[in-house]
């Protein structure tokens, strides 16, 4: 069995993520989604909890026609030391053969650790970006819904995600500044 690792924050998951997983599954038997920054939530850059992101991603993948029996989602907390983070990823996940990333620094870390690194499949990256989704939610622009699966949009609305992001933007949601 060939396993691929696909790290990301998925804040929130969008159609580009769904596309990437579908493309990765054309090359591997199973994809491990390493959901980074698992300990962060209710922040402008990280508004959703790890559990909420897992929920959104599973529903979005299901809506996108992905066989969830071939997908493992594992939350990975961040650490400040990059080599410690690499070790944490390796200890939290089942063994994997190849990593898919669009981040040159992540690619460097894994390549130096002896892993095969492949370019993450991209789908209209300038359009499909979690940063863009959060910015549109912050502005109250309803076009954010076009960028995510309908199931993800419904979850974001249920969680009052726009309100959460607007509150986080006020700066009151940063505990390290208290």
Swiss-Prot record:
Keywords: ATP-binding, Cytoplasm, NAD, Nucleotide-binding, Nucleotidyltransferase, Pyridine nucleotide biosynthesis, Transferase. The keyword Cytoplasm applies. Its EC number is 2.7.7.1. It catalyses: beta-nicotinamide D-ribonucleotide + ATP + H(+) = diphosphate + NAD(+). Gene3D superfamilies: HUPs (3.40.50.620). GO terms for molecular function: ATP binding; nicotinamide-nucleotide adenylyltransferase activity. The keyword Nucleotide-binding applies. Pfam families: CTP_transf_like. It is an enzyme of class 2 (transferase). GO terms for biological process: NAD biosynthetic process. One of its GO terms (cellular component) is cytoplasm. Belongs to the archaeal NMN adenylyltransferase family. This is Nicotinamide-nucleotide adenylyltransferase. It is found in: Cytoplasm. Pathway: Cofactor biosynthesis; NAD(+) biosynthesis; NAD(+) from nicotinamide D-ribonucleotide: step 1/1. PANTHER family: BIFUNCTIONAL NMN ADENYLYLTRANSFERASE_NUDIX HYDROLASE, PHOSPHOPANTETHEINE ADENYLYLTRANSFERASE. The lineage of its organism: Archaea, Thermoproteota, Thermoprotei, Thermoproteales, Thermoproteaceae.
């Amino acid at each position: 069995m060939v396993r691929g690792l696909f790290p990301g924050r998925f804040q929130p998951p969008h159609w580009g993520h769904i596309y990437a997983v579908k493309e990765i599954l054309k090359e591997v038997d199973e994809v491990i989604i390493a959901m980074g920054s698992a300990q962060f939530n209710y922040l402008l850059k990280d508004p959703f909890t790890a559990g909420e992101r897992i929920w959104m991603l599973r529903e979005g993948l299901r809506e996108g026609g992905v066989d969830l029996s071939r997908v493992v989602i594992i939350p990975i907390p961040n650490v400040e030391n990059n080599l410690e983070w690499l070790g944490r990823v390796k200890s939290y996940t089942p063994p994997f053969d190849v990593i898919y990333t669009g981040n040159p620094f992540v690619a460097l870390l894994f390549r130096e650790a002896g892993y095969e690194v492949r370019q993450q499949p991209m789908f209209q990256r300038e359009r499909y970006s979690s940063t863009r989704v959060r910015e549109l939610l912050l502005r109250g622009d309803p076009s954010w819904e076009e960028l995510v699966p309908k199931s993800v949009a419904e979850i974001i609305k249920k969680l009052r995600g726009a309100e959460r992001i607007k509150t986080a933007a006020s700066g009151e949601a940063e505990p390290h500044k208290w």
